[in-house]
Amino acid sequence: GIQLVDKFDASYHSGNYFLKQIAQAKMTVSELENHFQSIMRKHQEKNILLNYTLTHDVNSWQGSSEELYGDAYPMLTAFTYIYPGMPLLYSGQEYDLNKRLLFFEKDNFPKEIGETMDLLKDLGSLKNTSDALTVGKNQASFFSLTPKVTMNNGVENQIFSFQRAGEKDTLVFVANMSKNYAQFNFDFNGNFFEYPNGKEKILSDSYEYVMKPWEYWILIK
């Protein structure tokens, strides 16, 4: 129970269930955000949340990353690194594991470097170097930006966004958590650089944005 979390440095939570629901269009962005903010309030600074898409149980009994998340997988992987907490990786994710490993028997996976390896290297480097992603008692601040989004095509909100800030760095995460294009305005202003390509990105409340399905931005200043 939540009464025990201060006895441990880190703990699991049910976030991957909600990420799976998002990938399969069975949940709204509002429901996802409400869950994660509820978990943050319960744990506060007592305990580090483990954010993940796969564990041994999830892989063996529910499915591979492709089965569960499809094209949303890169965006949701980035989310587990950027949202407050510590990312947890399961064996084989770095090699684009695309099968269910046997649970009670020895199994293996091909160690062939694919697209996910580069993604994880970039995310890991950012996690280790940016004080905007610090966790624990002196963790970076968190502020939801999702309420600043206004969709322009009459659909329910598809955009999940938040800001994290440390003493030196400020980071903004913006994600289209939908299989459809998102057209929206964003009541937020600032000059940033995209990670990892370093391109300048200007955010303005006067702009209209279009994001591809499952597209995400990691913006730093």
Predicted segments, located by residue:
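Active-site-proximal helices and loops of the catalytic beta/alpha 8
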Residues: 1-49, 79, 96-131, 136-138, ...
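Short, well-ordered loop/turn elements at secondary-structure boundaries
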Residues: 45-46, 82-85, 167-169, 212-213
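Asparagine-centered strand-capping/turn motif at beta-strand->loop junctions
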Residues: 173-178
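A residue-level signal for conserved active-site and pocket-lining positions in enzyme catalytic cores
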Residues: 56, 123, 214
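C-terminal beta-strand-rich structural cap/linker in extracellular carbohydrate-active enzymes
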Residues: 203-221
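Aromatic/acidic polysaccharide-binding cleft in carbohydrate-active enzymes
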Residues: 47-115
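Solvent-exposed beta-hairpin/edge-strand motifs
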Residues: 187-199
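Short hydrophobic/aromatic beta-strand or adjacent loop that forms the aromatic wall/cage
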Residues: 157-159, 169, 213-218
